[in-house]
Amino acid sequence: MNYRHIFHAGNFADVFKHLLLARALEYFQQKNKPYFVLDTHGGIGYYDLQGDQAVRTAEAEQGIVRFAEHSAEEPLAGAYLNIVRQLNEEQDKLRYYPGSPVITSEFLRENDRLVVCELHKEDAETLKNTPLGRHKQVQILAPMDGYQAVRAQLPPAEKRGLVLIDPPFENTTEFDDVVSALEQGLKRWKSGSFAVWYPIKDELKTAAFHRDVGALSDLPKTLIMELNIRTNDERKGLHGCGFLWVNPPYGVVQDSEHLLPVLCKTLAQDKGANFHSRWLVGEQLLT
């Protein structure tokens, strides 16, 4: 594995991903019953945006820095932005960015549970040495293949919860691996909520991924949400990303109708920016 998320931490894709993740966790909190979260690709947990690697790309400047400045009063982003602010309360400017396991940990109550996986050996060691490693409700399985954890950890004792599948997509088989993981996960936990983040680089590959997921037998309702911040230009790096969300929380479905336009307007880099959402299975066309 060569991918290191520190180069991209806090970019537009992280804002898209983590804002919707935070909204989902807020809805899970609304019921008294405990919930379970499996994060298959946890990274290192905390990211220093002033470190050499992050500064080299400066992607956070067009991501979380811009979003925090221009959407500070957005009600649906309140919990997400508060987590970011609390991590930086002793800083003159935004320096540290929380990865998905850190964000999830902020929503855990006494009986809720988070299992985090990370395969990259160096990142796994870093993750274990963060405050997450001392969190009573958090179990870090690292180094471990997150796809194997889908088979090993499901179904959880808790009746409800979320699986976040957020791989680096550096392997040519990654989309196929995700489809296989979804198939295995749904066999074990049909009522679980499965959120798959993916990059949009090749429209044909993205369409094939949607088609392959849609071909799974007895697939529950599945929502696709996508954000493109500029016209596709390979020389400028990643231009778009999406969530394929099986059994999405109802509140997230409703929130996305408001948040996708906000994200697009705030993070757009040229006139080619756009967003859309649609049901792959079930419900109706949204935007």
Role assignments for model-derived ranges:
Residues M1-T287:
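Class I S-adenosyl-L-methionine-dependent methyltransferase catalytic core
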